């Protein structure tokens, strides 16, 4: 495919205000969904993350791994159970979860980023007590809710030019048991603790939709709560919007729910006027170049 050099130059020029705006910003990216099982999509995601780092953004990647967990549990003959969309995690299951998330999935993402010329280091919520949890719900077993965060290790990594890749498993507060943490929940807690400029939740849908099925480009927290109350937001989108509202309450500037299957979704959201998906925020955007 022949590229128009003039159009390429124009695109780069139009990105300048955003490059200035996001220089030094912390952007937490939750990577999950079908893109995780596609090598080409994984490579494209990694390339976007490396580019963000190269132009001065500090990306922190948090990942899920549900399909891979289900696959290994099936091979081991361990039945998967879910309550209100969350995995029931008994002792046998949590060992598999940790093996898949901290081992297989985490290292695949790290390798993909390194293959694109980045410097990535994989850790879990256990490392340096990044996340300490209590049980989220007795019905769910070893599913954790983060109650203490130590994100200095993440700052140390990105200040050294390294991209942290975090597996959402954590240590229990009371007895040092291992807990599985929902990937969106972990990403929101990390973003809040870092006071991140953006939290990007990559999914397999285009964003939050209204009652007619149209994707909404932006919402306020009060609008989100109203849509949940009326049932317009339902199913799997409810926990994602709950994560978004909790992150905003914790000090994150804005949360974006976007389709991770779209090529260059993260770059479109961060560096273009159009953005991608649905942005949820309480304040007006700051998208203009700095005035000297």
From Swiss-Prot:
Subcellular compartments: Cytoplasm
GO molecular function: acetylglutamate kinase activity; ATP binding
Gene3D superfamilies in UniProt: Acetylglutamate kinase-like (3.40.1160.10)
InterPro entries: AceGlu_kinase-like_sf, AcgluKinase_fam, ArgB, Asp/Glu/Uridylate_kinase, Glu/AcGlu_kinase, NAGK-C
Keyword terms, alphabetized: Amino-acid biosynthesis, Arginine biosynthesis, ATP-binding, Cytoplasm, Kinase, Nucleotide-binding, Transferase
Pathway assigned to this chain's UniProt record: Amino-acid biosynthesis; L-arginine biosynthesis; N(2)-acetyl-L-ornithine from L-glutamate: step 2/4
Site keyed Transition state stabilizer: positions: 30, 240
Enzyme type, top EC level: transferase
A Pfam family this chain is assigned to: AA_kinase
Main location: cytoplasm
Enzyme Commission identifier(s): 2.7.2.8
GO CC list: cytoplasm
Binding residues annotated for substrate, in chain numbering: 65-66, 87, 180
Known catalytic reactions: N-acetyl-L-glutamate + ATP = N-acetyl-L-glutamyl 5-phosphate + ADP
Source organism, top-level taxon: Bacteria
GO BP annotations listed: arginine biosynthetic process via ornithine; L-arginine biosynthetic process
Family: Belongs to the acetylglutamate kinase family. ArgB subfamily.
Function recorded in the entry: Catalyzes the ATP-dependent phosphorylation of N-acetyl-L-glutamate.
Name the UniProt record assigns to this protein: Acetylglutamate kinase
Originating organism: Cereibacter sphaeroides (strain ATCC 17025 / ATH 2.4.3)
Gene name per UniProt: argB
């Amino acid at each position: 495919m022949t590229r128009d050099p003039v159009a390429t130059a124009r695109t780069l020029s139009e990105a300048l205000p955003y490059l200035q705006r996001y220089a030094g910003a912390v952007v937490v990216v939750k990577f999950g969904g079908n893109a995780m099982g596609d090598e080409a999509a994984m490579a494209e995601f990694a390339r976007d993350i490396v580019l963000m780092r190269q132009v001065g953004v500090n990306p922190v990647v948090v990942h899920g791994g549900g399909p891979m967990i289900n696959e290994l549990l099936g091979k081991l003959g361990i039945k998967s159970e879910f309550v209100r969309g969350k995995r029931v995690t008994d002792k046998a299951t949590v060992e598999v979860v940790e093996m898949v998330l901290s081992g297989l999935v985490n290292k695949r993402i790290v390798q993909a980023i390194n293959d694109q010329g980045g410097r990535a280091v994989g850790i879990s919520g256990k490392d340096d007590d990044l996340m300490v949890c209590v049980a989220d719900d007795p019905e769910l077993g070893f599913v954790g809710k983060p109650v203490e965060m130590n994100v200095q290790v993440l700052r140390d990594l990105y200040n050294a030019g390294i991209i942290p890749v975090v597996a959402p498993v954590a240590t229990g507060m009371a007895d040092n048991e291992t807990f599985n943490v929902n990937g969106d929940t972990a990403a929101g807690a990390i973003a809040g603790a870092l006071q991140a400029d953006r939290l990007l939740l990559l999914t397999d849908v285009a964003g939050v939709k209204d009652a007619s099925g149209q994707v909404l480009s932006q919402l306020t927290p009060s609008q989100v709560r109203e849509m949940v109350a009326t049932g317009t937001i339902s199913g799997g989108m409810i926990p994602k919007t709950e994560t978004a509202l909790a992150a905003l309450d914790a000090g994150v500037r804005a949360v974006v729910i976007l389709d991770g299957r779209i090529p260059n979704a993260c770059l479109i959201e961060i560096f273009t006027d159009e953005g991608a998906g649905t942005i949820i925020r309480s304040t007006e955007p700051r998208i203009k170049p700095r005035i000297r």
